[in-house]
From Swiss-Prot:
<dbReference type="InterPro" id="IPR000594">
    <property type="entry name" value="ThiF_NAD_FAD-bd"/>
</dbReference>
<dbReference type="InterPro" id="IPR019572">
    <property type="entry name" value="UBA_E1_SCCH"/>
</dbReference>
<dbReference type="Pfam" id="PF16191">
    <property type="entry name" value="E1_4HB"/>
</dbReference>
<dbReference type="GO" id="GO:0006511">
    <property type="term" value="P:ubiquitin-dependent protein catabolic process"/>
</dbReference>
<dbReference type="InterPro" id="IPR032418">
    <property type="entry name" value="E1_FCCH"/>
</dbReference>
<feature type="binding site">
    <location>
        <position position="498"/>
    </location>
    <ligand>
        <name>ATP</name>
    </ligand>
</feature>
<dbReference type="InterPro" id="IPR018074">
    <property type="entry name" value="UBQ-activ_enz_E1_CS"/>
</dbReference>
<dbReference type="InterPro" id="IPR045886">
    <property type="entry name" value="ThiF/MoeB/HesA"/>
</dbReference>
<dbReference type="Pfam" id="PF10585">
    <property type="entry name" value="UBA_E1_SCCH"/>
</dbReference>
<comment type="pathway">
    <text>Protein modification; protein ubiquitination.</text>
</comment>
<dbReference type="Pfam" id="PF09358">
    <property type="entry name" value="E1_UFD"/>
</dbReference>
<comment type="subunit">
    <text>Monomer.</text>
</comment>
<dbReference type="GO" id="GO:0005524">
    <property type="term" value="F:ATP binding"/>
</dbReference>
<keyword id="KW-0547">Nucleotide-binding</keyword>
<dbReference type="GO" id="GO:0006974">
    <property type="term" value="P:DNA damage response"/>
</dbReference>
<dbReference type="GO" id="GO:0004839">
    <property type="term" value="F:ubiquitin activating enzyme activity"/>
</dbReference>
<dbReference type="GO" id="GO:0005634">
    <property type="term" value="C:nucleus"/>
</dbReference>
């Protein structure tokens, strides 16, 4: 990650790191403050854009001022620290009084065999610091005292006795202000979290969602008042929500800013707990907006919460009775460790029995809360594997706890209240494990072997995995797989592919990359970093996009050799393609995705679960073209329009110019052939660029930008309101300018308005770039010289035109109207274009500008934000800053490290099952989680849909095969034997046979493969022995029957 103010901070940080590595103990808060003084609270928006989209500036600033202690640097502590350093807190102090063991290499990716024997905390400092030089990372060794804790806003303990935890928590709880205390443990396949943020903790934003809004259509004078909204979009209000009103005409009493309560919320209306019978009558207009009040949470201290835990946060409702038992189990383990000063030995019957006895003993003291039954088998698994910190569990809980620290330091999102327990005991092999299988082998995988046994470990090491994508998810997966030993034997292989390169904005989450990797391929850099984590990892990094075009690379032999596929993708199209290949080759697919604090995982297991493509989210609703171009009513509409205009003016039109200049004859011929309104518009834009609007000096670019301002934000609005005055009525007699339409007003230009001047300068700079005109320094910031240059431009007076057609129909797909004279106009334009082109200097060309959102120095977002905000000003829509504009126009997907880490941890818990084999669908889990609320919803996957016909049944996972170089007739007869009447056979997008076409009957006695070669132009590669055809069938009652893909093995 790139540092902020590196020149100020780096030297002091390095000195402090030397101090901690020399074993001189902690860095004091004063030293840390001095070293970080140069950092300030400025935010590198290029670097943190995806995280800013989740947290916002205020939360980020609070994080920048937070000092955090992480105690216990086994895998869980390392994961928490990693997520906090990436998030950008002020400082992270690592504490551990133990030394690195080979055992730790199963879960802590900062450690290597060379670190064995060193203090764990000190061994992690340097590599953690590399992730973000703007965060001060230091180590504290030796005994921890309560006085140490006073230096922090939040403290996290991952390996501490219950007695000590209660002592520290009491201290933290009693401080003013309280210090947030978090205790979390990962013990084998079991984990726990406890949070105490003090007697009264204020949550500033409970869910992180944008406040819901609605456009008012009517309000009754009643008690309670009925508020109806336009049916453009469903309302998201819930009973009990508080809302405020603005812009209401008539019933102006509601515009007082007072929050009012919603009740009986419906999709397009709700009642307001307000007597409006004496208010003015509603006339028109109005925006209703949700108010999100702060929430105060009262936490119990740990000592009290242990005996009165209240409701546990649930995750898997098939394990409804599990949390109270695990609450007991962790206490029993603590007692075992306190009395014997060690963990139970894996597979030791005596040790397991002792933990069970402790659990029974503690249970007997619980009175009304005593459990009626204790699952001894579950406690056996818990105790036996309790010494192990497994990487997937550490990754999952590292995400959860990292997010809780962010909540504690910022007040953003609802804290976990107060206990959370989780287990993945289903990840254990189906066959019982013998004690001998669990014995350590003096290996870096010993912790994992102590839980799963050496047989499964061998399977993991020999696995052949295909991982698609090496971005945020991919980096986490690679780290996890390397620590788990996946593909780490001579027979194992991990193929990684990603066609993307590293950008600056990646560095805040994609922790395998550094600033010096910017511009390099993601896959090769990530693979190299993963091999540093585990040098035995057999990984092959490719830069091919997995798609139909690369099936020569990822061919049949490649797919058939795989054991599992892991998706680390960020788009649905690629996911659907990989899903189709996994179904075709019957390979397990482990799917996951994130959106801000939310994440989901889906297991796609051959013959057991439905595939990814079986259920899809509905497409995002698109605003009608007429709304975006003439009747916007929110900032999203303005930004959609702004980006469209940016691309039209600065990318598409210069590209059209170059297309004409590179081959005038072909270009003109294509325009004549098209002969439509679109071709006419393109020719007009090209001529404008080369004639009337051609720029030769920077002042010409200023003139162009100023006149565009007048055209867009004054003249067009004047024309629109001339065509549709404010009192216009529709053909049905309703007011034309009724909700959601907003009546616009022109913006009058003033060079003293900084936002207007900035927009014109940015637009002029980009216009100049398209013509290759040098940019003067004075033009890069609003100043007196710039204002004078803009004021020089002579702006003609506008005269509205009669008979102008403006698209108002919501289903219109084009703003260009066809005309019977298009062909004649095109001929005139072509003649004009040929004439203009003769005046151009030799070699003239334009430089199209492709929108790039992640470079704040290129003026792209200045233009788009300026476009959108001037448009918003026309329509009295609230304006946004450049950062918010970037999120919307740049279609930035909000992303943080914590949800990504959690998702990959959950997936890797499923990977144990997929590679072990033999598991039933009931053993697998899909997850949806929202760390903001927090919500964890874990459930069994849905089985695939079964289709039945006579005695046959099949699912999406089945493929029918026919052996032999058969004819079409023989294929029809083969299906007839199954009681199916085939009426259509296709290959790819081509129809090989249809019973309705007489000529197709001539093909019946030809080989299927020969017809495919002739009709579908299908060349079957030499490595493939079969051809796939899609057959449409009916049963004897003429009902369509969906049958599987049919593979004809002709070789």
């Amino acid at each position: 990650m790139l540092p902020r103010k590196r020149e100020i901070v780096a030297g002091e940080v390095e000195d402090l790191q030397k101090k901690t590595r020399a074993g001189e103990g902690e860095v004091t808060r004063e030293e840390g403050d001095a070293a970080m003084a140069g950092r300030g609270n400025e935010i590198d928006e290029d670097l943190h854009s995806r995280q800013l989209a989740v947290y916002g500036r205020e939360t980020m600033k609070r994080l920048f001022g937070s000092n955090v202690l992480v105690s216990g640097l086994q895998g869980l502590g390392a994961e928490i620290a990693k997520n906090l350093v990436l998030a950008g807190v002020k400082s992270v102090t690592l504490h551990d009084d133990g030394n690195v063991e080979l055992w730790d290499l199963s879960s802590n990716f900062f450690l290597s065999e060379n670190d064995v024997g060193q203090n764990r905390a000190q061994a992690c400092v340097q590599k953690l610091q590399e992730l973000n030089n703007a965060v001060l990372v230091s180590a504290l060794t030796g005994d921890l005292t309560k006085e140490h804790l006073s230096k922090f806003q939040a403290v996290v303990f991952t390996d501490i006795s219950l007695d000590k935890a209660i002592e520290f928590d009491d201290y933290c709880h009693s401080q003013q202000p309280p210090i947030a205390f978090i205790k979390s443990e990962v013990r084998g396949l079991f984990g726990s979290v406890f949070c105490d943020f003090g007697p009264e903790f204020t949550v500033l934003d409970v869910d992180g969602e944008e406040p819901h809004t609605g456009i008012v259509a009517s309000i009754s004078n009643d008690n309670p008042a009925l508020v109806s909204c336009v049916d453009d979009e469903r309302l998201e209000f819930q009973d009990g929500d508080l809302v405020v009103f603005s812009e209401v005409h008539g019933m102006t009493e509601l515009n007082d800013g007072k929050p009012r309560k919603v009740k009986n919320a419906r999709p397009y209306s709700f009642f307001l707990e307000e007597d409006t019978s004496s208010f003015g009558a509603y006339v028109r207009g109005g925006i209703v907006t949700q108010v999100k009040p702060p929430k105060v949470i009262k936490f119990k201290p740990l000592k009290e919460a242990m005996s009165e835990p209240g409701e546990f946060l649930m995750s898997d409702f098939s394990k409804f009775e599990r949390p109270p038992l695990l609450h007991l189990a962790f206490q029993a383990l603590d007692k075992f460790r306190t009395e014997l000063s060690r963990f139970p030995v894996a597979g030791s019957t005596d040790d397991v029995q002792r933990v069970i006895e402790y659990a029974i003993s503690i249970n007997d003291t619980l009175g009304d809360r005593k459990l009626e039954e204790i699952d001894k088998k579950l406690l056996h698994h818990f105790a036996s594997g309790s010494r192990a910190v497994l990487n997937p569990m550490a990754a999952m809980f590292g995400g959860i706890v990292g997010q809780e620290v962010v909540k504690a330091c910022s007040g953003k999102f609802h804290p976990l209240y107060q206990f959370f327990y989780f287990d993945s005991v289903e990840s254990l092999p189906v066959d019982p494990l013998e004690p001998g299988d669990l014995k350590p082998k003096n290996s870096r995988y010993d912790a994992q072997i102590s839980v799963f046994g050496s047989k499964l470990q061998n399977k993991l090491e020999e696995a052949k995995i295909f991982m698609v994508g090496s971005g945020a998810l991919g980096c986490e997966f690679l780290k996890n797989l390397a620590l788990m030993g996946i593909s780490c034997s001579q027979n194992g292989n991990l193929t990684l592919t990603d066609d993307d390169v590293i950008e600056k904005s990646n560095l805040s989450r994609q922790f395998l990359f550094r600033d010096w990797n910017i511009g390099q391929p993601k896959s090769t850099v990530a693979a190299t970093a993963a091999m540093v984590i585990n040098p035995k990892l057999h990984v092959e990094a490719l830069q091919n996009r997995a798609s139909p075009e690369t099936e020569n690379v990822f061919n049949d032999a490649f797919w058939e050799n795989l054991d599992a596929v892991v998706n680390a993708l960020d788009n649905v199209t690629a996911r659907m393609y990989i899903d189709s290949r996994c179904v075709y080759f019957q390979k397990p697919l482990l799917e996951s995705g994130t959106l801000g604090a939310k994440c989901n995982t889906q297991m796609v297991i051959p013959h057991l679960t439905e595939n990814y493509g079986a259920s899809r989210d509905p497409p995002e609703k698109q605003a009608p073209m007429c709304t975006v171009h003439s009747f916007p009513h929110n900032i999203d509409h303005c930004l959609t329009w702004a980006r469209s205009e940016f691309e039209g003016l600065l990318e598409k039109t210069p590209t059209e110019v170059n297309a004409f200049l590179s081959n005038p004859t072909t270009y003109i011929s294509a325009a004549r052939t098209a002969g439509d309104a679109q071709a006419r518009d393109q020719l007009e834009r090209v001529i404008e660029c080369l004639d009337r609007d051609k720029c030769e000096t920077f002042q010409d670019s200023i003139t162009w930008a100023r006149l565009k301002f007048e055209d867009y934000f004054s003249n067009r609005v004047k024309q629109l309101t001339f065509t549709f005055p404010e009192d216009s009525m529709t053909s049905s007699g309703a007011p034309f300018w009724s909700a959601p339409k907003r009546f616009p007003r022109p913006v009058e230009f003033s060079s003293s308005d900084q936002s207007q001047l900035s927009f014109i300068l940015a637009a002029a700079i980009l216009r100049a770039e398209t013509f290759g005109i040098p940019i003067p320094e004075w033009a890069k910031t609003p100043n007196k010289l710039a204002a004078e240059a803009v004021d020089k431009v002579i702006v003609p007076d506008f005269q509205p035109k009669q008979g102008v057609k403006i698209v108002t129909h919501e289903k219109a797909t084009s703003l260009s109207s066809a005309s019977v004279d298009d062909a004649a106009v095109i001929e005139e334009l072509i003649a004009k274009l040929e004439e203009v082109s003769k005046t151009l200097p030799s070699g003239f060309h334009m430089n199209p500008i492709q929108f790039e959102k992640d470079d704040d120095t290129n003026f792209h977002m200045d233009v788009i934000a300026g476009f959108a905000n001037m448009r918003a000003r026309n329509y009295s829509i609230p304006e946004v800053d450049k950062l918010k504009a970037k999120f919307i126009a740049g279609r930035i997907i909000p992303a943080i490290a914590t949800s990504t880490a959690m998702a990959t941890g959950l997936v890797c818990l499923e990977l144990y099952k997929a590679l072990a084999g033999g598991h039933k669908v009931e053993d697998y889990r899909n997850t949806f989680a929202n760390l903001a609320i927090p919500l964890f919803s874990i459930a069994e996957p849905v089985p695939p849909k079964t289709i039945k016909h006579q005695e046959l049944s099949w699912t999406v996972w089945d493929r029918w095969t026919v052996t032999g170089n058969i004819t079409l007739r023989e294929l029809l007869e083969w299906l007839k034997e199954k009681g199916l009447n085939a009426y259509s056979i296709s290959c790819g997008t081509s129809l090989l046979y249809n019973s309705m076409f007489p000529r197709h009957k001539e093909r019946l006695d030809r080989k299927v493969v020969d017809v495919a070669r002739e009709v579908a132009k299908m060349e079957v590669p030499s490595y493939r022995r079969h051809l796939d055809v899609v057959v449409a069938c009916e049963d004897d009652d003429d009902n369509d029957v969906d049958i599987p893909l049919v593979s004809v093995y002709f070789r």
